[in-house]
Amino acid sequence: MRLIAHRGNLNGPNPLVENDPQRITYCIDEGYDVEIDVRYDHHTNMLWLGHDEPQHKVNWFWIAGRRDRLWIHCKDVATLHEFSTKTSGYNFFFHDKDDYTLTSK
């Protein structure tokens, strides 16, 4: 069984730690998978974590190092497209008001 920390939350919502890279690493170290919200900026080739807006900048190396434990919620179509061009086993998905969502794995 896999336990997934939604945005890095372990005990209910906590906006102060949601999608924070340090919190995500902590959850993974504690044995959890983590769902993260990601946006890709094609101008800078950087990735941003954040539910409603970009908040925490990370790079591809950071994502790749944790990819086996991440459930990557692509927050827009451009981010979905970028992840779909990668062949390194990322588990990503996109949805917008759907009854069901499929991931890439």
Cite the ranges covered by each PLM segment.
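Phosphate-group recognition and catalysis centered on beta-loop-alpha active-site segments
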Residues: M1-K105
